[in-house]
Regions:
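Structured segments of extracytoplasmic/periplasmic soluble domains
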Residues: 4-7, 27, 31, 46-50, ...
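Beta-strand-rich interaction/scaffold domains
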Residues: 33-36, 40, 74, 81-192
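Short loop/turn segments at secondary-structure transitions that flank enzyme active sites
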Residues: 30-34, 74, 121-126, 254-256, ...
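A short beta-strand-loop element at or near the start of a globular domain
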Residues: 1-33, 89-94, 196, 207-217, ...
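Extracellular calcium-associated, cysteine-rich motifs in secreted modular proteins
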Residues: 36-90
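Extracellular structured ligand-interaction cores
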Residues: 21-23, 74, 110-115, 224, ...
Length: 357
């Protein structure tokens, strides 16, 4: 993970690089569809009132500078304290806002839920052994993974935020008039962004350097099989997550030799574990499974009426759990077979059919 392989580190003439985890972050972005901006002022229409959505001279933050002007100078249209005239102003250094239409039940920016991230010990194989490994393995939403949940990596509250996260990694150059430390070097889309347990990744990633667990991709996938996500206090929320952009970033430090200064210095690197790759056009590589825990109908009369082999007088449907079948033409009742035969004999083409309750 440093400059030298573990085998080189273990040689007598070389010092250990002492790779140490500094930070581990899990990022799973929300799916965000392109949001229209009819007036071209840089603010999505979904975040503006009906009148402002078509008015480029609207002023979202009421700072006296129109949204279209703030877009031109690169000032923050959502912050009334920034209008581009400050002495320390840096253009385009503010977080963009997004319309989070991929979250069902999302009400406001202060909404929270509790998230538990754990190690998964269940191996999500890609091919089905029952088909001689010629077909993809199928997984169903009622599968029980509870006995395969390992160590807890995070357990805490997550706040839903529709803003990007900004990173400023530059150091200020004292010889310039601009404060480079205020410049945005990278942006992170809105989503779940939480720290994970450093000790776990120190033990299971960095300390495994040179061992069989990291010898090949197949060995690593069998060793670290995945993560398990579960939420509480989120009964009214449903998320669409973009797992193709999700990752775990391990930031670590190690001892490096500076040949010019002839000394050991502390260097820093990132190691990124991605979840899925690809897209709908090229295909998705990797496996992810979503499961649902559904309670049965609370009314015992409804539960007893389901799947009892008898024709029901009523139809009960529960999303994600039950299936209702309706027989339209019973062969023995209401002349059903005669109706079907008449349609066939006359070669009638049915353009439209409606079922009315």
């Amino acid at each position: 993970f440093g400059v030298l392989s573990q085998a080189r580190e273990d040689e007598a003439d070389n010092d250990q690089e002492n790779e140490t985890v500094k930070e581990v972050m899990l990022h799973i972005p929300f799916q965000t569809a392109p949001s229209p901006d009819l007036d071209g002022d840089g603010i999505p229409d979904a975040l503006e009132s009906d009148g402002d959505a078509t008015d480029p001279n609207s002023d979202w933050d009421n700072d006296g500078v129109s949204d279209i002007q703030e877009q031109a100078i690169g000032s923050n249209p959502y912050d009334s304290d920034e209008d581009g005239t400050g002495a320390d102003f840096v253009a385009n250094a503010y977080p963009n806002k997004f319309d989070l239409d991929s979250i069902y039940g999302y009400v406001d920016e202060e909404q929270t839920f509790n998230l538990v991230v754990s190690r998964s010990n269940y191996f999500l194989r890609g091919l089905d052994p029952n088909s001689n490994f010629e077909e993809a393995q199928e997984y169903y939403s009622n599968h029980d993974f509870s006995s395969f949940i390992g160590e807890t990596l995070f357990n805490g509250e997550v706040t839903i935020d529709n803003e990007e996260q900004l990173f400023r990694d530059n150091e200020d150059d004292p010889e310039t008039d601009v404060d480079e430390s205020l410049e945005v070097t990278s942006r992170l889309a809105p989503g779940i962004h939480v720290p994970l347990d450093n000790a776990f990744f120190q033990e299971n990633i960095l300390d495994k350097e040179g061992q069989t667990e990291l010898l090949s991709q197949s060995n690593f996938r069998n060793f670290l099989r995945g993560i398990h996500l579960s939420g509480t206090n989120a009964d009214d929320l449903m998320f669409l997550l973009d797992l193709t952009q999700a990752n775990i970033t391990i930031t670590y430090e190690y001892d490096d030799y500076d040949s010019e200064a002839d000394e050991i210095v502390t260097a820093e690197r990132d190691f990124v574990l991605s979840f899925l790759s690809g897209n709908a056009q090229s295909g998705i590589s990797g496996n992810a499974v979503n499961v649902f825990e559904n309670e049965m109908f609370p009314n015992p009369d409804i539960a007893n009426a389901l799947d009892n082999g008898e024709n029901a007088s009523r139809i009960y449907v529960k999303g994600g759990q039950t299936l209702a079948e309706i027989r339209l033409f019973d062969e023995m009742e209401n002349g059903g077979s005669d109706i079907i035969n008449q349609i066939k004999q006359n070669n009638w083409v049915i353009n439209e059919a409606n079922l009315t309750f």
